[in-house]
Amino acid sequence: RSVFKAFREAFVEQVQRMTIGNPQLESTDQGALISAAHRDKVERHLAVAHAEGGRLLCGGDRPALDDDLREGFYLRPSVFDSLPFDCRTNQEEIFGPLATLIPFDDETEVLTMANSTPYGLAASVWTRDFARAQRMSEGLDAGLVWINSWMSRDLRAPFGGVKQSGLGREGGLEAMRFFTESKTISWPR
């Protein structure tokens, strides 16, 4: 909690610097959402966050882009604070550019908040302390935990969620096991 204000300011500043546009360009940080229905779903979640008392710190609108990108389903990344960890916004899988910032006092408190959701696809732990990174990653109910990174993984490594975030694993030997249908044939002696 002691670093929350400084972290919030730095995080919002970084989000506001993100370049939205053509995902084929190296300079682009965020491309379009997959469809109009997807963008509409994320915008409904933005309305829910407002209704739950969230304070919008940045984003939440459709960016004005060049003519060749106007038909895309773009949405600026949104950052909220002032939302409780157990509100709908923080308990559902949104799959869109929406983040909420929540202060915490210790590891036990933040693990309780993070593990309260019925989902557990992926998580990210950011720290300079290796031992803390290990404790937190082991304590998180998530199928994949990144440490000091996001969206980086070896495609040979198993990937999949826990709880309501999926069944089975993709990637590596775990995927072969998941898609293998064993059959036992028994003959009498």
Model-derived features: positions:
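Conserved C-terminal structural/oligomerization subdomain of aldehyde/semialdehyde dehydrogenase
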Residues: 19, 67-70, 74-189
